[in-house]
Amino acid sequence: MKLHLIESDSVYRELLTLPVDQRDAVFKEKLLLPFKEKFAIQRISFDERIPFNVMTLMGYMHKMPKDLSEEDLQMINQFDKEFWENIKQAFNRSVESFISKGISLKQQDYYVTALLGNEASPMMRINENYSGDGGIPGYIFLSLVPNEYTINRIASAMAHECNHNIRYQFVDWEMGSLKEMIVAEGLAENFAEKMFGQENIGPWV
C-alpha cells in the first residue's frame, strides 16, 4: 500500500507568483490531475468548455486560483510540516485499523491532498469550514479554511473519509442516493469518533 500525499501549500505559493490567467492550468495540473480518474468516475469533466466541469465544482467550496492574494499566505502557511504529518498519521492509523481486523484492501495506491476552503462559501460555512471527499476508492480530498478549530479536527476528518474510501471498495456507489448517504455518513462519523473521540465529531451527525 502506498500513500501519495500531495502537499498543496507549495502549489499555492507558486500560484501567487503567476499571472492570474496562468493559474488555473497550474492548479489543475499539480493538484487536480492526480485525481482525474476519480472525477471521471463521478462524470466530472476537465474540459472547461463543458458548463459543469472540475473547476466549476471546485468553485463551490474552495479558494480559487484567480482569487488568491498575498493575504492568503497566512492560511497557506498553516499547511505546514506538522499539518501534513498529522494527515499522514491519521490516514495510516485509520487504514491499519481495518487491516488489523483481517480486511484485505483492494486498493493499493491512495492519493490525498488538502485544499484551501473559501470562508465565504455557504457550503463551507454549513460544514463549519471543513469537509472532505473520500467516496471514490484511492482518492481523498480534504477541504478547510485553516484555523485552530478546523486543523484540530483534520485527523478526525481523515478518519471519516478513510471509512468511506475503504467501504466503497466493497460496496457499489449508488450515485449518491439519500438512503446510501444516510448509512455512509453515519458509519463514517461513528468510525471517526471511535478513532479520535466524541469531542472531534463533525457537523454531519
For each feature predicted by the language model, list its residue ranges:
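N-terminal low-structure segments adjacent to metalloprotease catalytic domains
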Residues: 1-85
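Short pre-active-site segment immediately N-terminal to the catalytic Zn-binding motif
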Residues: 142-157
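Membrane-interface helix caps and helix-loop-helix hairpins in membrane proteins
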Residues: 172-174
